[in-house]
Amino acid sequence: MNFRYNQTPFGYQRRKTREVKVGDVKVGGNNPIVIQSMINSDTTDTQGSVKQILELERAGCEIVRLTVPSQADADNLPSIRQELKKAGSKVPLVADIHFTPSVAMKAVEYVEKVRINPGNFADKKKFAVRDYTDLKYNQELERISEVFSPLVLRCKELGVSMRIGTNHGSLSDRIMNRYGDTPQGMVESALEFIRIAESLGYYDIIVSMKASNPQVMVQAYRMLASRFNELKMDYPLHLGVTEAGDGNDGRIKSAIGIGSLLEDGLGDTIRVSLTEDPVLEVPVAKLLADKFNKKISNLNSVKGYSEFRNPFSYNRFYSSEIKIVQFEAGENHPVRVETILPFENSNSFLENVAKLYQYGKSLSIEPESILVDSPLPDQLKEISEAATALSIPVGILLSKNVSLNEKLQKELLSFPKIVFDPFLQFQDGEKMLSFLKERQNAGLFSEIHTSGDKLDSLRGLPDTLSEIGIKNVLFSLDSKEILYDYRKLGSILSRFEFPILLHGSFSNPEEALYNSAIGIGGLLIDGIGDLIRISTSKIKDIEEIFQLSYDLLQGTRLRLTKTEYISCPSCGRTLFDLQETTARIKSRTGHLKGVKIAVMGCIVNGPGEMADADFGYVGAGPGKVHLYRGKEIVLKNVPSEIADEKLVQLIKDNELWQDPSND
């Protein structure tokens, strides 16, 4: 299989795409990454729609999408256009179409772009299981072409662009039966429609591969880019994690998916989908776009590194086990979290640890490992004595200006793990190997931690360690280019079983949230990393960073430490106040660790886009809700006044309920 989907996974270069115009906005080519969003008002409500469009435009949104589910919505587009013209608005509009080709033919007259979903534009999903012969499959494609071609020809005639937007949760029965519920199915779904458009000489196409799980979404976009390379296609990519949710969780999921793809050079326009006021999506999108609009190509240090991943599926990078008393990491253990704490004296240190435990208790999480940040050598004895009061390992991060003399090496045998830079703290390589051997013989671990620019110098070390039987070593990096440098480290270590700790040091919690989600999150969804360690320079940030670390693991779906919510961003199809409903359901179910609950505004992105949710709460009509167990409807048309209680009872009936703690 050809794993190549970009220029290189080890450095930045944006993928070259064709330029597609959406009104006066240019997407792809050499243009900056374009920001877009979607209003959530009813499209038949002229004033409400215009108000939201203008608010988004003022916030910096460059393209605005609105849902057009019915003929009545399409008929109101001229009124919206007229009011926008009066207000002096020039923002291009996109009509979002599901199920209704006839409505698309009306809407195309009044918008700059049409978005169609290849999973439901010409198909009604019946969840039917059947074998398609090649003949039958081709007959289905001919049927689709008959339905789709009139819209393509009208777009071509009017100069209207189109997004062919696949959703993981709404693949057609035809695709599901041939390719399954997979990234490959998502890609082939879009390619079927692209080929029809190309056969009619139409190329003003933008493509998206959206999913609520960032891991699936990233794999699908990579596979699409790889197929584009094979087929000599150069269409721009619209990036987005659908149903990301709200708050930090929604921002983390979006940054993992969108940000890691932008690092790969993929993406020409982005939409951050939050279950919040649409205006609040724009600053998040701008933050992500600005980072990469300023980024320049850098392929200077990529030679000598080879692809060691399958970028289209998840496979955890195998490593040997780290076992310190009750602490276990690596091998098949969950990804662990290490917390950095300062040390002034025993009292303040133990007080900070106690605060961390107390905060962790409120999250139903206990701290797992602590690293003391750059203590003075004469503090080691006091730290060792303080650590005896704790049931979790306490390690030492050596200051860069500390030389590891023999006296200090002996004192460090009191600690289960130390972190050091081999290029700064040892002048003699043989002495370093002797030190590592001594620690291993004592059942202790050592973390080799150096800067990303020293990777070339690090290349031979794993071979040397393996030759002399040193196994109790893990590797980490201090780097501003977390994704690229850790991939290089992964390439170096791909023949070995040394564990990898993903380290990120940031100036403040907001920077930590976005950059750790992009860098560390982007690595985790590829199976790289056995532990994570995120820090800022301020002790006051420790609780926030502690929670961020576990939220990041939650966002990658590698470790669920709280209820997982899959909630759509709301649009004109939504049949209830999604923000209020989501908040209400969270207040009732937020303590159900590991349970996955989907909250969907309507059926379009309902059952399918719930992905692997255990339970679903989906709008069925005004004041009515369908409740799901998995993808199966178990209660239909439940009055919204009692739907929350019925959901709780459904969870109880399936023995996944636990009463909230009184703590």
UniProtKB/Swiss-Prot annotation:
Domain of life per record: Bacteria
EC code: 1.17.7.3
UniProt keyword annotation of Transport present: no
Known pathway: Isoprenoid biosynthesis; isopentenyl diphosphate biosynthesis via DXP pathway; isopentenyl diphosphate from 1-deoxy-D-xylulose 5-phosphate: step 5/6
Catalytic activity: (2E)-4-hydroxy-3-methylbut-2-enyl diphosphate + oxidized [flavodoxin] + H2O + 2 H(+) = 2-C-methyl-D-erythritol 2,4-cyclic diphosphate + reduced [flavodoxin]
Cofactor: [4Fe-4S] cluster
UniProt remark on cofactor binding: Binds 1 [4Fe-4S] cluster.
MF annotations from Gene Ontology: 4 iron, 4 sulfur cluster binding; 4-hydroxy-3-methylbut-2-en-1-yl diphosphate synthase activity (ferredoxin); 4-hydroxy-3-methylbut-2-enyl-diphosphate synthase activity (flavodoxin); iron ion binding
NCBIfam families membership: ispG_gcpE
Full protein name: 4-hydroxy-3-methylbut-2-en-1-yl diphosphate synthase (flavodoxin)
Organism of origin: Leptospira interrogans serogroup Icterohaemorrhagiae serovar copenhageni (strain Fiocruz L1-130)
